[in-house]
Amino acid sequence: DFPSYNFDVIDGVTYQIDISKPAKFDKDGKAVNPDSNRIVNLQFDGKPIDPEQKFVVATNNYRASGGGKFPDIAADKVIFVAPDTNRDVIVRYIIDQGTINPSADANWSFAPVANTTAIFETGPKGRNYAADIKGAKIEDAGDGAEGFAKFRLVL
């Protein structure tokens, strides 16, 4: 069990998640397979990331203070603290722009795993959009439990 709000997407880089490898951390952020790396093909500007390369990550105070039990997050690594909430910054941006056209840039995907599929359930209106998801082969797999729609993701 892993709450979906703890699944962070890092924008500005591209990467794949190799689910055939064991998880490095458990749900509490404790290293259980320290030599494992599920994140593969990590790139910035179309080039592999140098392990010594530095990046600045904008986040909220919950995550920066260790919320979500993400490893290697420490207060001494924070370089700027703003009084604004993420929500307020986004609202101001939308007001300033007047109109925005948000779209997912498909910067991450699952790494291919031969002869493997994953079954998941979601709202039935997902059937209207499954074909629009870039880089993913998603098939309708019928009806799920309690009014949900069932889908098959081909890895």
Task: Write out the residue ranges for each language-model feature.
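Catalytic centers of hydrolytic enzymes
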Residues: 1-155
